[in-house]
Amino acid sequence: MKTITLRPGQMTLADLRHIYQHPVHITLDESAYVPIQQSVDCVQAILAEQRTAYGINTGFGLLASTRIATEDLENLQRSIVLSHAAGVGEANDDAIVRLIMVLKINSLARGFSGIRLEVIQALITLVNAGVYPHIPLKGSVGASGDLAPLAHMSLLLLGEGKARYQGEWLPAHTALAQAGLQPLTLAAKEGLALLNGTQVSAAYALRGLFEAEDLYAAASVFGCLTVDAALGSRSPFDARIHAVRGQRGQIDAASTYRHLLGERSEISESHKNCDKVQDPYSLRCQPQVMGACLGQIRQAAEVLAIESNAVSDNPLVFAEQGDVLSGGNFHAEPVAMAADNLALALAEIGSLSECRISLMMDKHMSQLPPFLVENGGVNSGFMIAQVTAAALTSENKGLAFPASVDSIPTSANQEDHVSMAPRAGKRLWEMAENVRNILAIEWLAACQGLDLRKGLRTSAILEPARQLLRQHVTYYDKDRFFAPDIEVASQLIAQRHMNELMPAKLLPSL
């Protein structure tokens, strides 16, 4: 298990990818201790001076004008957690919950939330012990923060709710005991600090980012396999073409295709003197389309890297000046728009792949047997697999509709504009699964097409991708039950083998 020393505000996308994909041991850098304590001292000074400060000694939302008596402050913090834990739906899996918790720890430890080190360390202890609170998938509109899901996370600290440990749901007290913890009593401001923030929205979008990166890598590899299977030209990837346009993503995508295809292969040599002038767009324009997708992925990654290190609590404690300021950092609009950008990229990655699959079905376009099978008529080959890819592609078109343009008033119109960032991020998972299956079909089709080229080899970099599939799925000499092969190929893609074939530093978190 990897140990990560958390320096608040300095987590990288590579760190976050690892935290999402693997259990980790977190330690908090000691440089965080002083700012954390100073923010707590500031809250205590406000209480001692009997100043009124939102979230410290007032109600919440539309009830912000209600002053809370000092003797009720602890009960106020407990009440907000209990009342706000109103999420519904299936539970988030351990990987997402772990990522949510670490993002919350990172934000709180910046020292602008007025929450004690003891509470932050309790969250760290839970992560390190592999005790993951029950957090339902649904219930947040992404402003004022992700209140309901973060309340479910916080229930466990109070000894309420339940948590999963080694795959088993346990009552809160039992789960806390597994981590060596006792229930906490929250002090002034701490309940609100735990609940307010964009960490669930960010975690949902980060998962979408990581999956988009993995699928970008796979689509680049399989797109090159299809170029060779369809006897496509390498000239559209010439660096000069892309340099004169100047789009950074396109330039890098074209460089990736040159890297994968190599200067020559047995297949490219077999048709270098053919009379074909231009390839269809789905082969020829891959750098332009995939480069645009790469640009969207990178832009989203930049936003999510910032948000993952942000303080998105409200109010914020500025201890140096002794101020507590109310603002709107909990509004997850940047996350929602980043997720919408990722949705566009995923939809286009899948759409372009489906076009290449369709090309290979057509003997006039691919110069391969119809539907990639010999003895057509008796055999239908890839006919309906292509239809499945088409269905998934069209499904993603609907899912790609921007979530950030939606809003609905909440909290008696006090919170009258919301981001819908959780929905924006969560639908990326469904889109990614669709794209993974589309790419699985292309991988199967491209390798079938290559095998139909009399065993000619593709480039040295691409051959391992071809051989990996053939270790698990054999050549189609006749029709057979197709769905299991799609599932096998999809699972291999999910194992991220294609990332290893990508040039270094192409994708933000890799």
Swiss-Prot record:
Contains an active site 4-methylidene-imidazol-5-one (MIO), which is formed autocatalytically by cyclization and dehydration of residues Ala-Ser-Gly. One of its GO terms (cellular component) is cytoplasm. One of its GO terms (biological process) is L-histidine catabolic process to glutamate and formamide. It catalyses: L-histidine = trans-urocanate + NH4(+). Signal peptide: none annotated. Its main location: cytoplasm. There is a cross-link at residues 143-145 (5-imidazolinone (Ala-Gly)). InterPro entries: Aromatic_Lyase, Fumarase/histidase_N, HutH, L-Aspartase-like, Phe/His_NH3-lyase_AS. The modification 2,3-didehydroalanine (Ser) is found at residue 144. One of its GO terms (molecular function) is histidine ammonia-lyase activity. Pathway: Amino-acid degradation; L-histidine degradation into L-glutamate; N-formimidoyl-L-glutamate from L-histidine: step 1/3. Its EC number is 4.3.1.3. It is found in: Cytoplasm. It comes from the Bacteria. Keywords: Cytoplasm, Histidine metabolism, Lyase. Belongs to the PAL/histidase family. This is Histidine ammonia-lyase.
